[in-house]
């Protein structure tokens, strides 16, 4: 009996250790980002910016789909968040937006430095382009995108408040719930041909943006 009790104790200890290890792993994977932050999750870079209001980012399906993210927001002045890569560049970006509401745009979005440039390749929704200069159009991945350039003066950036250019390729016709591809090099080459120069690539993400007091949510995956 002593031996049996000892063995049972060892088994119980093993079960307890396994449960605790599982809890630690679950806690490590259950990341939550509120309002503002950058970091990594399941090998992907994430970024969340909120000027006002409230936004929360989680990664509910990252165990199966490492590029998955979800954001919920309410009353935001401007919210931009998503998942992708810490360094952008010429890539074939795949994505699927499983569900979305209350957003303005969903885009491949990123920054370069020297020069400081903020860029959008908009897949879903409509960019606000009233004050932007129309530069032409480009065909890529079976779609036609209209190209715009806009100067941002004393606005938030990855380098703090700054003056910089925005490059915008707007399509907006992608469907929710389907797989899509963005060949970023086609857009970058097109911009360069127009004299819209890019610098060194900073992060590049599949970004959801909402503004003007919007409330909503999104669940999307990038790869």
Language-model features: where?
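Short, flexible beta-strand-to-coil junctions
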Residues: 23-24, 96-102, 111-114, 174, ...
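Extracellular-facing segments of soluble proteins and assemblies that are Gly/Ser/Thr-biased and enriched
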Residues: 78-140
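An exposed acidic His-Trp-rich patch
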Residues: 114-177
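Long, compositionally biased interface segments
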Residues: 178-223
């Amino acid at each position: 009996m002593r031996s049996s009790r000892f063995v049972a104790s060892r088994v119980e200890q093993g079960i307890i250790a396994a449960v605790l290890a599982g809890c630690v792993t679950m806690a490590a994977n259950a990341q939550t980002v509120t309002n503002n932050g950058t970091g990594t999750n399941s090998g992907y870079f994430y970024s969340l910016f909120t000027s006002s209001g409230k936004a929360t980012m989680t990664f509910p399906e990252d165990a199966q789909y490492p590029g998955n993210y979800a954001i919920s927001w309410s009353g935001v002045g401007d919210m931009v968040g998503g998942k992708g890569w810490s360094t952008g560049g010429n890539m074939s970006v795949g994505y699927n937006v499983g569900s979305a509401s209350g957003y303005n745009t969903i885009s491949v979005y990123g920054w370069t430095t020297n020069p400081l440039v903020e860029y959008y390749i908009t897949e879903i929704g409509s960019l606000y382009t009233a004050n932007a200069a129309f530069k032409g159009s480009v065909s890529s991945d079976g779609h036609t995108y209209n190209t715009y350039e806009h100067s941002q003066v004393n606005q938030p950036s990855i380098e703090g408040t700054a003056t910089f250019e925005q490059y915008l390729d707007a399509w907006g016709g992608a469907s929710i719930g389907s797989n899509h591809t963005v060949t970023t090099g086609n857009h970058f080459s097109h911009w360069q041909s127009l004299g819209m120069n890019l610098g060194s690539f900073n992060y590049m993400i599949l970004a959801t943006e909402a503004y003007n007091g919007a409330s909503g949510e999104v669940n999307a995956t990038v790869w």
